[in-house]
């Protein structure tokens, strides 16, 4: 698979960096926008770091890559990519490895150009770009050698005078010493202002100050690269004179990296004498077993150091040696080791807010059975039910009975409550009564806790819309007019209207009028009312009576009809029921 996106971003970023003009702010803005995208295209989708031994899916068009060590782990993408779910299709990608190396070389090149100085001076994007440069720059590897420009990123930016200026001032000139006693070894300079260092620039440096008999050399060592040192005919013997074997339990000071108490651009500078004076307070304690992690920032382009052996010490020291116009001066910054006024933790601040309430305000009867004081946490949030408190010099306020009643008592009250139902009652009254019945507490109600109310779903209304279509149900809705069921061509079901004239049946057909076809009308009526008619006897027009034999379900009224010529409508109709 060809990582087209990462390749295109690398070409664009390289073109911008090579054509960078310090006087053009637009070019710096473009680099600031493009470089993070290039770094993101070379990120592992599992760990998020720069790719190491990258592998990529073979039969996929997505630009998702992972490290070889992260193969099989869950990716951080949401939603997940459907094209690269199967890790069996991932293979090593040589082009990605080349792009990662190109990214590192590009970052190394940036540290040696004026662009690095502009990145440090920029306030908005300094931290982000410096983090990218640290991630890609191989300055921390032992195989690479850094130049003076690269080291300027991690050392203090103070003017460095020449050797002639150092020796021109007699009061500040120190005693000379041979060049063979100078031993300066600095390894591992990184970019200043990175998030991992909080403004510091060296990964791990150590400065060791020995007893007076070995006070002629200083060894500054760490992991990284060697730095070129210049010959100087001055030493730090007067500075190291105040140190004695009684002050230090062993032969020196070990200074490592720390990353907390010093903010970027705000390092504290103290003289070496003040640092050594502060070390005298620690001379009575055993400092050989402590392993604290301070860091060192040193500019040793002009000035020798005394070589010492590195036993650990329990002080955090930040040393910066800058050459001044009047001589070599060693300055050090001591970060705060012990914070007297430390910040309170969240648990401590929360525990101070907890105040116990009197028992009498919580125990309201024998049913609760509480015998221990209950602590209530004070909060600013509004609660559903306020907690009853006892005023100063007063008595316990009464708590409403609804809060103290149990489930059974509430249910009993609801069951024994008089139920009034009237068909012509107002709907507003019915709704309030239904809601009151639906509210049933689920558990024993404790004071101070919100009551849980369970709402039941309203029962669906059965029957047709006749008389129920409006907000005010009425039995006179369909009287004298067509009902809504007739308009929808449906039969009425449990109709509450009086005089409803809907002629539709359940099967969707209309009823025939009784005077049209008597036999058909009776059959349709039987289907509508569900009557089993075994025999229907209708006498001729000449007969005086009509006898109808009906068997089936009891019917109070039955429709009987005769022909148009039959004028004996006032004669009796005999109906027999066989139950």
Swiss-Prot record:
Q: What is its EC number?
A: 2.3.2.27
Q: Which domain of life is it from?
A: Eukaryota
Positions annotated to bind Zn(2+) 5: 478, 492, 497, 500
Which cystines does this chain contain?
Answer: none
Zinc finger (RING-type) in chain: 44-85
Q: Name one GO cellular component term.
A: chromatin
- Tell me, which GO biological process terms does this entry list? DNA damage response; epigenetic regulation of gene expression; positive regulation of DNA-templated transcription; protein monoubiquitination; protein ubiquitination
Q: How does it assemble?
A: Component of a multisubunit histone acetyltransferase complex (MSL).
Protein name per its UniProtKB record: E3 ubiquitin-protein ligase MSL2
Q: Organism source for this protein?
A: Gallus gallus
- Give the organism's phylogenetic lineage: Eukaryota, Metazoa, Chordata, Craniata, Vertebrata
* Gene behind this protein: MSL2
